[in-house]
A protein has these predicted regions:
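Beta-strand/loop substructures that line and gate deep hydrophobic ligand-binding cavities in soluble
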Residues: 81-134
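A structural signal for well-ordered alpha-helical scaffolds and beta->alpha junctions
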Residues: 14, 59, 129-132
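Glycine-rich portal/gate segments that line the openings of hydrophobic small-molecule binding cavities
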Residues: 28-29, 38-85, 134, 138-147
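A generic beta-sheet turn/junction motif
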Residues: 10, 57, 100-102
Length: 147
């Protein structure tokens, strides 16, 4: 099992960051890899069990399902249902924690998954860098932060 953990501190208050990240169907508004997003069957994006279909900039598609959501703890989990890349049993967790020194936000994004033998490092790099770190940089731009 591969485990990827990335985190960052954003120069924005937690309420503002949560407003953006909480929208399970809104990644296309800020993540550079996502061209379009829609929930299947018109399900609300904050309904546990809803499935989002993401079309990537390269034209490929994937499906993810929201499995937990907590406004109280400002976190959620989701799993990957269909993907063109070899990620199996993928479950990810996003959690925000207030940083009271300066009204900032700590963001943890982590996942566990399996992949084909010999591809563990490549898939960990893809998830950690091309998805998570790229997402951190993109959310900063979206929130108007200076990098």
């Amino acid at each position: 099992m591969v485990r990827v953990v990335r985190s960052t501190v954003l120069e924005s208050p937690i309420g503002r960051v949560w407003e953006v990240l909480r929208d399970f169907n809104g990644f296309d508004r800020w993540h550079p890899a996502i061209a379009a997003s829609e929930t299947e069957r018109g399900a609300p994006a904050d309904q546990v069990g809803c499935v989002r279909r993401l079309r990537l900039k390269d034209g490929s598609e994937l499906r993810e399902q929201l499995i937990t959501l907590s406004d109280l703890e400002q976190c959620y989990s989701y799993c990957l249902l269909d993907t063109p890349i070899p990620l199996f049993n993928y479950v990810a967790h996003i959690r925000l924690v207030p940083v009271t020194d300066g009204d900032r936000t700590f963001w943890s994004w982590q996942s566990r998954f399996t992949t084909r033998r010999g591809e563990e490092q490549a898939m960990a790099r893809l998830v950690g860098e091309d998805i998570y770190r790229a997402g951190f940089a993109a959310i900063r731009r979206h929130l108007g932060e200076v990098a």
